[in-house]
């Protein structure tokens, strides 16, 4: 059985964050992961269709059906990386599947701690009995490695959503504090999931805030997986497209 890289590239054909133009950079992500998988004897799976209307369940929540999706497509697997399509992987990225110790793995979200803490406080107050989790253990759900022992946990995530769907949809619109990410972090802690943190090099998020995303492409010498999120003044995701295209061409076409 092979290890699987699972990502999503779904045309929501809407406006704003649902606009089709938001998908334009994803081809560079998918191409980079395709080449990394070929080099490391893994298989890439790209989900291109919604399972449920986005009004019923935000697209980010739908990835927690991935075990059912792979099973429905007769795909056998050992371990699975669930990764966002706004990432580029370095061609020489080490095989992180060999680093997991068969645990769930992710990377601490070294982004805006103001946003993270506000999100923790709000979701903790309304969904987790006022509990505040340790923000230093908060991960970005755009990079999570799992295996079949985590199937039940993913079902618990879906069950949590279904039990709280109406309120979750409401707070997603009103708080602007994320969708699945903070609740899933709480659930990882609440369910006692045996977890292993990988270093920042394996999910380099919020690179603009760290002043490492630049035309010299220096960041590609200091890490392995780059996530192009939280880019200021990113109208119609044009800067995401610019940087992902530039990074892909720098790494794969020079």
For each predicted feature, which ranges?
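N-terminal anchoring/stem segment of glycosyltransferases
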Residues: 1-77, 230-232, 247-254
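A structural signal for short, well-ordered beta-strand segments and their strand-loop junctions
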Residues: 5, 44-47, 81-84, 105-107, ...
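Short catalytic/ligand-binding loop motif for oxyanion handling, primarily in non-cytosolic enzymes
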Residues: 14-15, 52-55, 89-92, 97-98, ...
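Short, charged/polar micro-motifs that form catalytic or ligand-binding hotspots
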Residues: 20-23, 57, 134, 140, ...
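Short amphipathic alpha-helical segments and helix-helix/interface helices
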Residues: 30-34, 67, 93-97, 184-185
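GT-A fold catalytic core of metal-dependent nucleotide-sugar glycosyltransferases
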Residues: 59-121, 145-146, 150-151
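Catalytic core and acceptor-binding pocket of nucleotide-sugar-dependent glycosyltransferases
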Residues: 65, 136-239
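Short, flexible, basic/aromatic active-site loop/helix in glycosyltransferases
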Residues: 121-135, 152
């Amino acid at each position: 059985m092979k290890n699987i890289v699972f990502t999503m590239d779904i045309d929501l054909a809407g406006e704003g964050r649902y606009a089709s133009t938001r998908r334009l950079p994803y081809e560079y992500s998918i191409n980079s992961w395709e080449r990394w998988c070929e080099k490391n004897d893994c298989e890439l799976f790209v989900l291109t269709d919604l399972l449920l209307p986005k009004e019923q369940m935000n697209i980010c929540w739908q990835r927690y059906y991935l075990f059912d999706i792979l099973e429905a497509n007769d795909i056998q697997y050992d371990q699975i990386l669930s990764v966002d399509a706004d990432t580029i992987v370095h061609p020489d990225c080490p095989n992180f599947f060999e680093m997991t110790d068969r645990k769930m793995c992710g990377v601490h979200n070294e982004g805006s701690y103001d946003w993270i803490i506000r999100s923790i406080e709000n979701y903790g107050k309304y969904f987790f009995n006022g509990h505040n989790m340790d923000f230093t253990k908060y991960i970005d759900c755009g990079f999570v490695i799992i295996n079949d022992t985590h199937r039940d946990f993913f079902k618990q995530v879906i069950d949590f959503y279904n039990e709280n769907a109406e309120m979750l949809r409401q707070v997603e619109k009103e708080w602007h504090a994320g969708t699945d990410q903070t609740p899933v972090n709480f659930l990882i802690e609440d369910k006692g999931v045996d977890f292993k943190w990988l270093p920042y090099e394996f999910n380099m998020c919020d690179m603009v805030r760290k002043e490492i995303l630049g035309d010299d492409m220096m960041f590609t010498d200091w890490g392995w997986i780059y996530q192009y999120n939280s880019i200021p003044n990113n109208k119609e995701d044009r800067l995401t497209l610019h940087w992902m295209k530039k990074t892909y061409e720098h790494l794969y076409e020079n």
